[in-house]
From Swiss-Prot:
The keyword Chaperone belongs to this UniProt entry's keyword annotation: no
Region feature (Disordered): 241-302, 427-453, 517-539
Alphabetized Gene3D superfamilies for the sequence: 1.20.5.340, Myosin, subunit A (4.10.270.10)
Region (Rodlike tail) residue spans: 39-539
Biased composition (Polar residues): 427-439
Coiled coil: 39-520
Protein name as catalogued: Myosin heavy chain, clone 203
Function: Myosin is a protein that binds to F-actin and has ATPase activity that is activated by F-actin.
GO molecular function annotation: actin filament binding; ATP binding; microfilament motor activity
Amino acid sequence: RSEYKKMVAQRIGLAVIQRNVRKYLFLRHWSWWKLYTKVQPLLSVARAEDEMRAKEEELEAAKEQLKKDAEAKKKMEEELTEAMAQKEKLYASLQAETDRLITIEDKLLNLQTVKDKLESSLNEALEKLDGEEHSVLVLEEKIQEAEEKIDELTEKTEELQSNISRLETEKQNRDKQIDTLNEDIRKQDETISKMNAEKKHVDEELKDRTEQLQAAEDKCNNLNKTKNKLESSIREIEQDLKKEKDSKMKLEKEKKKVESDLKDNRDKLSETETRLKETQDLVTKREKSISDLENAKEGLESQISQLQRKIQELLAKIEELEEELENERKLRQKSELQRKELESRIEELQDQLETAGGATSAQVEVGKKREAECNRLRKEIEALNIANDAAISAIKAKTNATIAEIQEENEAMKKAKAKLEKEKSALNNELNETKNSLDQIKKQKTNSDKNSRMLEEQINELNSKLAQVDELHSQSESKNSKVNSELLALNSQLSESEHNLGIATKNIKTLESQLAESKNFNEAESKAKLENYNSSNAF
């Protein structure tokens, strides 16, 4: 289709040329035409001088416009340098933020290892504590059984006292039997004294075990509390680390985007510089009508004024962003100080946990020894119970056999009663001592509860401080996002201004090409006229 159009145009042009040649051949010898060919070049030469002067004036105006364009370009280069400096500042802050994140990750790994060690030691301590509690329960059951046996013996002594009052009348006929009974009572007293000694020993062992158990419980409670503290602090640090990683990823993406935009801007500026050089080379060849140049000039002036307005707006926004970045730096410094305080607090807690871990290892060895002693005492108590049951059964048989024969044992039974009362008072004293020890244990428990409440208050304070730090961090992140959005808007505006500048350069190129074409056309026309004039003179 394009070839067809070209052929049609060539055919029309050929017909026009043939018509013009035919007319020229017909009129070339006409006297008026000879006169016109002689006079017309002289008229066109005068008009050409006027046109050349007008073109020179247009050229001066174009040079002034070029100077203005160069000044605008210089301003844009200055703005670009300022943007590059701002970008370097942002890159430095980003690098500092990444370094801080790396240190936080290292601390988190250390805290995780400490947490694992504490959990293992705590589990071992809990297992040993369960074993100690079981052994203490067994000892308490044995003590309760011994107390029940003592109560039975006291009841039997009361029955014997009633039998004594009833058998005083038969005392005279049973002297021989009284001797044998006294021997039996002596043996019974020996067995009772042995049982009391064993009971006292068992009570002392129980007291020691209860004290050790209370100490172990206190240590386990402290370990649990410190573990809970560390777990809460680790969870909070993990959340902060996740947020910091997200912000880091966002900053890296924005950094890449800003770098790509800056690269594009540099390429565009280099292209504009080359175009401006080309325009400077081609400005000397401009020759076009005044109306076209004035219209182009007005369009360029309007575009330049718009660009200057946009540049002023961008400068104002950059100043606002610098103020916001300064405020954000202050907030970050505050948050870093608070984080350092919290890290020092966590290190103190780690030291406490390490000391507690050493105490638990020593406690494990003591627990093993105590378990062996508890097993030995359990066996001895079982043997004593068997022996006591056998002795009590023998005493019952003998007393039942000799009750009918006992007559006169008032004095001996009174002595036995006095002994039993002494033993009873001793048992009561031991019971009072055990009660006092239980009261002390309760007091220790209340003190431990107070300490736990105090630690919980400290945990709440730490949580509140961490919440404040998180709020400051979230504020800084929101400000970062706002700054980034504004930077994106500025980049878009800069790209628009560059696009407008490219359009202006294209318009300048088209004007230059039109000037070159008009100049060539004028030169060709003047040459043709001179040739015609010379040919007419030759004729």
